[in-house]
Amino acid sequence: MEEDHPTTYRFDPKTVALIGKYQSREISESLSLLARELERRGLTVIVEKSTAESASSPEFERWARCDFAGIGQRADVAIVLGGDGTMLNAARQLAHYCVPLVGVNQGRLGFMTDIARS
């Protein structure tokens, strides 16, 4: 009965985009772990093009790469690993597409990226 309630919202993403702070070794490792876990759960993973290019791992070759326009057209949700600046950039780039963002804080203090990496 709860499913019929007008405020109930079911979100069942199939494609997840990963966006990370460029040139960050720690984020490359976290993105790789996250991508593998998402795949294990049956989700399609795409990685933002510049994030993949700056990653130090050849493992990133296995996932599709997209620019922000491609993410906007293909992703059901985007997970942003970085700080508030990375989150603001992703939000600005994807605002036109209305892709929901989830921020994972990789820095010391995050106001918008409030989920801790651990």
Describe each model-derived feature in a short phrase.
Residues M1-V77, S118:
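ATP/NTP phosphate-donor binding region
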Residues E53, P58, W63-S118:
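Small-residue-rich beta-alpha loop regions that form the catalytic core of phosphotransfer
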